């Protein structure tokens, strides 16, 4: 494809395929604050005569969406790619190494190349480099063009950095992949071997990283008719991008040539860098969730096995500001349970039974996570251990501490039953029939789900792959050794996969990759791991914040970030009617809030908090409780540098016990601690389901931002469709330090950042509470005299000299904040255990240091007072509010939208599309003088002339002869091949593969090898590599549905099973391996297995009886067979076949029983299959 620009009448940009063009033009919409553009799918011929010309020399390999940056709309395209994988014949996977963003509503960036720093390339004389078509003989990549030009300082100052530069860097870093003929978002088992449509209806949006960019385009597509949808899907206009890893290597198993592929897909739902994305979110999505699939394809069989990884599905975080980041669990067991269950229900529906492999250490730093993990599993009423989920704890560090990483294979005996019961996906290529399906999945995790997880997933994958090879008698059990070439290549693939996942999450390659690649750990490998660890520490503290910002921008998760809206007359009508009918899908409700602040002065003794939390008993029961505590640890140098985070647990327990003394139960939804500051967020159990997007943040301001004795901890959440933010602060002390407190406030207000880059101003309701340390500016004697006299109006007289009241009234700080009427005595400073103000030598002036102020039109204060507690030198303060919150019924809103669309179409029949030639709502006016789009033009000169003839720029010189200008003359576009079939522009050469040293990879072919070429084929050329051209059948017919009513019998004679099928290849008889004989399999384990060092014994915990009513609903799944056999002469299906394992050897095997499964029907043979040529194999050895 190519990208064209026209400035006739209105500015338009078109992405043009061989037959159609997708035309975009900006729209100034009066009824929408969002950036809006119109899109039209038109036949290519309609672009003639509309002034279109090439906007870029680079071939467009895919359109990946629209995005708004800094008020500008950009069209995102793939302009550089290399072919890296071929999981099955005719299906290729490409790595993205270059993208371009073309501005739709501004001409500033037209015809410009951008350098690696994001600035336009300029020549030595200061002119900007204008893109010009290279000559046919030129194979220079974009980097060579840029290296031939230099930017002058003056020119750089004139031209700003490209707004999409950071996104270009992110998308071009080698971790993004796409395919034009293969659905990368689904596993091979789900996709199947039928002629699979690349329809967006079939894609798994969880792995589609350009989902935000394509959101409106997909909506536009869904409203088209079937013909138009097929055009968009099949012509490359809609491209799905995944992030992860994909690579294929080729090897031989005995004499059978095979392609070995690993594809990893990372979910974008909770995407981010290591310390910015931990645990689970409110929708049940976990950080670093990756689905990894290993595929083997040969001319005889296809095999696939899928595993998943993901962060522990509980709410936990780590403080990046510490050298040894502390693990903090931020939500209680009860509050976490619904989200925890939702996560596993989703996995169960998608993969079947889930076997958890927990690799966390039993050391104190990780043991709390393991304990919480098991507690959540046991408390689940929807997922039952031993039925839906299975847990194996394997302390990786302890198991490998003595015998090295080879001891990781000890995991296999512990999970053998699940390996046999879940099976693997296998397909008979020759006969075009499904043999087995995987039913179940291993979910592996460590702390980061990287290094330990990589090694265990590799170990499990090799064990299952060995099982497949033995079952299909492609290798003998004794011949499968680690020195085999294909085993070494598989190990190298897994090492590359681990490095790529680690690069995405941490910015460095994986630890232990030296062992993964070579099977042994050398001194250089250990030194490399130490270097990576130091690099990770630097990246975590100085780089990850910017990377997280770029990821959130790409995914549309920044505050108030919206998709580029596609103009649609119907959409305009619907939006107007939605505003008028908002009350039909929107409801409002009042909730009660209780907010408290207390400087506890390091107190660690239990006390009754009822007078603070329930000042009027059970007459007021809040829906939400937020408490801010200060000085939960003593403010000494030692305690500040080594904060005791166990104090948070002490206060959590004491507050929870007090809140739950009545019938209503409260759940802890968030705790945030920074040194001596702590904020607790509780909600009533029957209200917790309304709360989403809970997040926390901290900011240090003590000693210039170094220590946490002063600063802020904050939490935010959404209650329905209303957002709340609470900031608990401890500002600088001292009556004269007003400027320091102003600086603290501004520093906190600007720098508190929640997940997805939300900040304090982005919320509907704000609360600022804590020990604000504002004083009364009268003398100590004057204040105490007023407090002793208690004359009428003494509180108001003292408030006139209150620094905070003065600051708010002057608008210096806390702009827009209000404080309820203050009618209580100063809360600081008291003698401990009394109601007497400070009698020490310092004799502090009594002041209202402890305050609660608010901001929000939906807030109505009900009460504001102190509480008579005597456990600190401060008095606790509380405030009660009634908040009006909004709820949006999304289902009702969607129903209303559909009704409005139907209503509009009934009253405006002209808005309906009538066929493939009228695919858009409004056509551009077609000029009478139609100029052929592909006409050849002969022109001279080196200038690119603007269509409006207002400017001209000199094109940069390329290697070889001077390029011809890209001017639209009477003949149309230049740089077109003589046969008018394709533009004569060659893309940059792809990078050399890591495994195949030659410039082109050797493809899977039994008889011939042909190189992989990343350049799109020209018309008339074949796009099929060797395997497709010589040994691959045409797309196989659909596999018939399996039926439980007709169990498949395997009662075949020994001679039938041992007799090799024959195929004819050029007159030669080529025997095939015997089909595998299945084994019996035992059921999955009904226990929680916990590894014991140097032991294969598992401790068993009896699960509770299963509750049928609480079992998660799973779509009807027909059990598919998987054949697991070791000996062809064991034909009695009732007999238990087994593999013997010696517990003393990590490579040996215990008895692995299998259970019977059904066998699918065999469809009629495809005559094309008989044309396959395969390598000759010896007849099967029954022994």
From Swiss-Prot:
Predominant subcellular localization, coarse grouping: cytoplasm
Primary enzyme class: hydrolase
Disulfide bonds: none
InterPro entries: Endo/exonu/phosph_ase_sf (IPR036691), IP5 (IPR046985), IPPc (IPR000300), SAC_dom (IPR002013)
Modification sites for Phosphothreonine: 1032
Chain residue ranges for the region called Disordered: 133-161, 955-1183
GO biological process: endocytosis; phosphatidylinositol dephosphorylation; protein transport
Pfam families, sorted: Exo_endo_phos2, Syja_N
Residues with the Phosphoserine modification: 152, 522, 1005, 1016, 1095
Keyword Protein transport: yes
Reaction equation(s) it catalyzes: a 1,2-diacyl-sn-glycero-3-phospho-(1D-myo-inositol-4,5-bisphosphate) + H2O = a 1,2-diacyl-sn-glycero-3-phospho-(1D-myo-inositol 4-phosphate) + phosphate
A single cellular component GO annotation: mating projection tip
Compositional bias (Low complexity): 133-153, 955-968
Family per record: Belongs to the synaptojanin family. In the central section; belongs to the inositol 1,4,5-trisphosphate 5-phosphatase family.
Self-association and partners: Interacts (via SAC domain) with BSP1; the interaction is direct. Interacts with ABP1.
Protein name (database record): Polyphosphatidylinositol phosphatase INP52
UniProt source species: Saccharomyces cerevisiae (strain ATCC 204508 / S288c)
Gene: INP52
């Amino acid at each position: 494809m190519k990208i064209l620009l026209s400035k006739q009448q209105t500015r338009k940009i078109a992405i043009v395929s061989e037959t159609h063009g997708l035309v975009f033009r900006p729209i100034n919409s009066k009824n929408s604050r969002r950036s809006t553009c119109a899109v039209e799918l038109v036949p290519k011929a309609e672009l003639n005569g509309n002034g279109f010309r090439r906007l870029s020399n680079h071939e467009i390999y895919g359109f990946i969406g629209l995005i708004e940056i800094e008020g500008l709309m950009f069209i995102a395209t793939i302009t550089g790619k290399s072919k890296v994988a071929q999981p099955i014949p005719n299906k290729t996977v490409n790595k993205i190494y270059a993208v371009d963003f073309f501005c739709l509503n501004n001409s500033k960036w037209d015809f410009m190349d951008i350098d690696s720093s994001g600035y336009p390339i300029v020549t030595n004389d200061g002119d900007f480099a204008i893109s010009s078509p290279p000559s046919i003989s030129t194979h220079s990549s974009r980097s060579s063009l840029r290296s031939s030009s230099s930017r002058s300082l003056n020119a750089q100052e004139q031209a700003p950095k490209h707004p999409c530069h950071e996104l270009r860097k992110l998308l071009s870093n080698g971790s993004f992949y796409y395919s034009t003929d293969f659905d990368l978002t689904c596993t091979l088992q789900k996709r199947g071997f039928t002629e699979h449509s690349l329809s967006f209806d079939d894609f798994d949006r969880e792995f589609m990283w350009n989902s935000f960019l394509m959101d409106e385009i997909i909506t536009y597509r869904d409203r088209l008719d079937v013909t138009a949808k097929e055009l968009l899907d099949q012509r490359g206009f809609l491209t799905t991008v995944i992030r992860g890893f994909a690579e294929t290597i080729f090897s031989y198993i005995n004499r059978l040539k095979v392609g070995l592929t690993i594809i990893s897909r990372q979910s974008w739902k909770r995407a981010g860098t290591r310390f910015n994305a931990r645990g689970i979110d409110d929708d049940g999505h976990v950080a670093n969730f990756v689905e990894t699939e290993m595929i083997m394809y040969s001319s005889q069989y296809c095999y696939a096995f899928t595993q998943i990884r993901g962060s522990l599905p509980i709410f936990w975080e780590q403080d990046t500001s510490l050298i040894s980041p502390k693990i903090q669990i931020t939500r209680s067991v009860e509050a976490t349970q619904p989200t925890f269950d939702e996560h596993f229900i989703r996995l169960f529906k998608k993969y079947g039974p889930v076997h958890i492999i927990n690799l966390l250490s039993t050391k104190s730093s990780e043991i709390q996570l393991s304990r919480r993990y098991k507690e959540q599993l046991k408390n689940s009423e929807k997922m039952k251990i031993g039925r839906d989920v299975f847990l194996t704890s394997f302390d990786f560090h302890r198991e490998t501490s003595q015998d090295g990483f080879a001891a990781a294979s000890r995991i296999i005996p512990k999970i053998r039953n699940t390996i046999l019961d879940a099976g693997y996906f296998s397909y008979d290529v020759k006969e075009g029939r499904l043999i087995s399906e995987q039913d179940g999945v291993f979910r592996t995790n460590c702390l980061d789900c990287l290094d330990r997880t990589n090694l265990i997933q590799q170990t499990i994958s090799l064990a299952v792959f060995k099982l497949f090879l033995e079952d299909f008698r492609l290798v003998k059990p004794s011949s499968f050794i680690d020195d085999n070439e294909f085993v070494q290549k598989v190990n190298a693939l897994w090492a590359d996969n681990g490095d790529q996942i680690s690069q995405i999450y941490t910015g460095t390659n994986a630890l232990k990759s030296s062992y993964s690649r070579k099977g042994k750990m050398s001194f250089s490998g250990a030194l490399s791991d130490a270097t990576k660890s130091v690099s990770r520490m630097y990246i975590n503290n100085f780089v990850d914040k910017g990377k997280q910002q770029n990821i959130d921008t790409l995914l549309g998760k920044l505050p108030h970030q919206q998709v580029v809206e596609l103009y649609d007359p119907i959409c305009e009508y619907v939006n107007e009617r939605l505003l008028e009918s908002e009350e039909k899908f929107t409801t409002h409700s009042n909730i009660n809030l209780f907010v408290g602040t207390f400087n506890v002065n390091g107190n660690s003794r239990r006390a009754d908090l009822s007078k603070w939390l329930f000042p009027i008993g059970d007459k007021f029961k809040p829906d939400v409780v937020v408490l801010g505590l200060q000085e939960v640890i003593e403010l000494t140098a030692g305690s500040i540098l080594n904060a005791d985070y166990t104090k948070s647990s002490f206060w959590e327990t004491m507050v929870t016990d007090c809140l739950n003394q009545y019938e209503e139960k409260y759940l802890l939804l968030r705790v945030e601690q920074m040194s001596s500051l702590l904020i607790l967020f509780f909600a009533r159990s029957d209200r917790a389901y309304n709360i989403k997007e809970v997040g926390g943040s901290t900011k240090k301001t003590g000693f210039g931002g170094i220590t946490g004795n002063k600063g802020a901890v904050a939490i935010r959440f959404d209650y329905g469709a209303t957002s709340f933010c609470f900031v608990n602060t401890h500002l600088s002390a001292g009556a004269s330090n007003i400027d320091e407190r102003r600086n603290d406030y501004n520093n906190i207000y600007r720098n508190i950042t929640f997940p997805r880059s939300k900040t304090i101003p982005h919320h509907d309701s704000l609360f600022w509470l804590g020990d604000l340390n504002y004083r009364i500016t009268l003398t100590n004697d004057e204040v105490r005299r007023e407090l002793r006299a208690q004359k009428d109006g003494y509180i108001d007289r003292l408030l006139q000299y209150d620094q905070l009241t003065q600051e708010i009234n002057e608008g210096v700080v806390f702009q827009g904040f209000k404080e309820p009427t203050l009618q209580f005595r100063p809360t600081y400073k008291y003698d401990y255990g009394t109601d007497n103000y400070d009698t020490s030598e310092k004799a502090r002036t009594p002041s209202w240091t402890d305050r609660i102020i608010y901001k929000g039109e939906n807030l109505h204060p009900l009460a504001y007072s102190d509480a008579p507690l005597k456990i600190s030198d401060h008095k606790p303060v509380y405030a009660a509010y009634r908040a009006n919150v909004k709820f949006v019924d999304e289902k009702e809103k969607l129903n209303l939208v559909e009704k409005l669309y139907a209503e509009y179409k009934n009253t405006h029949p002209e808005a309906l599309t009538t066929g493939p030639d009228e695919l858009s709502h409004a056509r551009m006016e077609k000029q009478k003088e139609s100029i052929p789009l592909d006409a050849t033009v002969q022109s001279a000169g080196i200038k690119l002339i603007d269509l409006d003839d207002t400017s001209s720029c000199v094109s940069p010189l390329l290697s070889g002869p001077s390029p011809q200008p890209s001017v639209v003359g009477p003949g149309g576009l230049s740089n077109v091949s003589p046969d008018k079939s394709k533009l004569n522009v060659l893309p940059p050469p792809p990078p050399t593969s890591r495994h195949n040293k030659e410039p082109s990879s050797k493809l899977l072919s039994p008889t011939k090898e042909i190189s992989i070429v990343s350049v799109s084929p020209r018309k008339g050329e074949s796009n099929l590599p060797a395997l497709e051209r010589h040994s691959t059948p045409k797309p196989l017919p659909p596999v018939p549905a399996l039926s439980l009513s007709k169990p498949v019998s395997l009662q075949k004679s020994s001679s039938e099973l041992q007799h090799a099928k024959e195929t004819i290849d050029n007159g030669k008889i080529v025997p095939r391996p015997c089909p595998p004989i299945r084994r019996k399999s035992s059921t999955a384990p009904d226990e929680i297995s916990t590894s014991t060092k140097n032991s294969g014994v598992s401790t068993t915990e009896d699960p509770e009886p299963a509750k049928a009513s609480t079992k998660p609903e799973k779509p009807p799944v027909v059990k598919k067979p998987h054949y697991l056999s070791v000996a062809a002469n064991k034909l009695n299906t009732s007999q238990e076949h087994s593999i013997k394992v010696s517990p003393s050897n990590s490579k040996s095997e215990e008895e692995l029983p299998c259970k019977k499964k059904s066998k699918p029907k065999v469809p009629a043979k495809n005559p094309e299959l008989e044309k396959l040529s395969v390598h000759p194999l010896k007849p099967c050895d029954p022994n």
